């Protein structure tokens, strides 16, 4: 018997078996407008499951706008046309439960944004909002999430301390732990290491490489070295268009588009 408490979005997502599909998320004929200004005019991409895909390009090229469209973070400020396909659903359609969809497509922002709560509560708070109140369950998920974000050994004895007392790199990894606590399929990251020092950046990269065993990861970065180190695929954006998308090794050693080569080699602009 169907669970009548489930939304249509929940039922459709649960009915789709991702094991039968290599593509976790795709966009078709995607266009994004801020008023009359078109920020994305050619945004057709497919993201393979359990891979890291990097979105690169100059400032203002549209890569962050594109990323934020993937879980409809732009809904209030932009008009998005075209299809965003996830588990057989066009999640850009009006009948999608956006709140439920975001449980499956998580987001980590450029600057760490921990809650003004304890380390433990930063993760447990969202779980309680979803009806999970049993302490044993909360404890297990908090520990699992912190372990996956490579933080558990650093904070296991300080879970009741304020998250605001953590270093910038630790705060960002806590935000990653918070995002994965509800076990999304896909993790979106908008320049997650741009405000961090090299050591913290390396720790974030190592964390993402571990996480891709269980998550599909899409990351915006201005750091070419970072893209080449951690991503399996790279898309080059310019002026709101995806000019090239291929395996990262191919993009960095044998780009097919002159502008891609210019950007990677530092001769762009």
UniProtKB/Swiss-Prot annotation:
Its EC number is 7.3.2.1. The keyword Cytoplasm does not apply. It is a peripheral membrane protein. InterPro entries: AAA+_ATPase, ABC_transporter-like_ATP-bd, ABC_transporter-like_CS, P-loop_NTPase, PstB-like. Its main location: membrane. ATP binds at residues 57-64. GO terms for molecular function: ATP binding; ATP hydrolysis activity; ATPase-coupled phosphate ion transmembrane transporter activity. One of its GO terms (cellular component) is plasma membrane. Pfam families: ABC_tran (PF00005). Residues 25-264 form the ABC transporter domain. It catalyses: phosphate(out) + ATP + H2O = ADP + 2 phosphate(in) + H(+). One of its GO terms (biological process) is phosphate ion transmembrane transport. Belongs to the ABC transporter superfamily. Phosphate importer (TC 3.A.1.7) family. The complex is composed of two ATP-binding proteins (PstB), two transmembrane proteins (PstC and PstA) and a solute-binding protein (PstS). This is Phosphate import ATP-binding protein PstB 1. It comes from Lactiplantibacillus plantarum (strain ATCC BAA-793 / NCIMB 8826 / WCFS1).
């Amino acid at each position: 018997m169907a669970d009548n408490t489930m939304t249509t979005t929940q039922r459709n997502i649960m009915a789709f078996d991702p094991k039968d599909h290599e593509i976790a998320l795709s966009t078709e004929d995607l266009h994004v407008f801020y008023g009359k200004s078109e920020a994305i005019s050619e945004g057709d991409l497919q993201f393979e499951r359990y891979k890291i895909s990097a979105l690169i390009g100059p400032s203002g090229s549209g890569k962050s706008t594109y990323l934020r469209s993937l879980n409809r973070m732009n809904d209030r400020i932009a008009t998005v046309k075209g299809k965003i396909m996830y588990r057989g659903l066009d999640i850009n359609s009006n009948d999608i439960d956006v709140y439920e969809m975001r449980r499956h497509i998580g987001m980590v922002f450029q600057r760490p944004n921990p809650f003004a709560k304890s380390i433990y509560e930063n993760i447990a708070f969202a779980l309680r909002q979803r009806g999970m109140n049993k302490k044993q369950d909360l404890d297990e998920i908090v520990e699992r999430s912190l372990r996956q974000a490579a933080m558990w050994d650093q904070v296991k004895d300080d879970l009741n301390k304020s998250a605001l007392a953590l270093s910038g790199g630790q705060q960002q990894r806590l935000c990653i732990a918070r995002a994965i606590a509800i076990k999304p399929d896909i993790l979106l990251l908008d320049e997650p290491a741009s405000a961090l020092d090299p050591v913290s950046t390396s720790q974030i990269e190592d964390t993402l490489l571990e996480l891709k065993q269980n998550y599909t990861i899409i990351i915006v970065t201005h750091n070419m070295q970072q893209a080449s180190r951690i991503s399996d695929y790279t898309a080059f954006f310019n002026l709101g268009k995806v000019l090239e998308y291929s395996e990262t090794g191919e993009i960095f050693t044998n780009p097919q588009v002159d502008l891609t080569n210019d950007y990677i080699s530092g001769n762009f602009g």
